[in-house]
Amino acid sequence: MGDAWQRTKRITSAAFRPVRGRDLSLHAAAITFYGGIAVVPVALLAIWLTSLLVGGDRVRRLTSYAVETLPNAIGAPRAVDALVAAGVELTPLLALASLLPASLYGEGLRRAFVSVAASHTEESLVGWRGRLLLLPLLAPAPALLLSILIALPTTTRLVRQGGWIGALGVVLSFLAVWLVLTPVLMWVFRVVGPDSPDWLSTLALGSFTAANLSGFLHGFVLFASLPLDLGAPFGGFDEIGACVAVLLWLYLFHVIVLAGYSATLALSRWRASRA
């Protein structure tokens, strides 16, 4: 038991060596700032591209399953419904205008990753590199989003039944999000990040990080269903409380992403040293 514990400590210490001495919380907060600007434009572009591929009516029909199932405590169904409607009705000109704020997410990720990858601390044009390297992810966005939307009728129907059948629906939903996030994180870790870890390390840790993020996102849905008075700390303004809650969860989301990138770099460097 003692040897297993010591081995676990050594592995954990090695995984977080790239972020040792750096303020992980501050970098996660920085990504959250950029992400807060980019999250709506990214979602709009993904929905718009998907609607061009399969039609707006089908996108509305598939997303309606999620809208009907999401908890209403912080207004999530109304927000998702409005987001889908705006994305489906997006014009090419508005889509072009959304590209700039959407690309800011890549800048935030690249800047944070540069601070973790010590070999690139003097890199120039960090922001623009991150923006341009993130944009190719828009190409597979319709296929990735559609794979989740196609699973929604089945998973939401199972969740509504409750009990063990409902638990099966949650598991299937978890697996769908996990499979979609894995290639996204592989691209982010290997291409958007300044250091390019080897493919095996990227696949292993990218998939593991995606599994954690999938569970985390489902945890947010559970949180949104709790009867909490989010406006209490803000003078009764529920909208402000809901926004702060979303930003807090987005911040924790990026802590996991940074930790995953750090572990990927550590594994890749360890494998290179053994080669």
Can you describe what each PLM-predicted range is?
Residues 1-275:
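Membrane-embedded alpha-helices and immediately adjacent juxtamembrane helical segments
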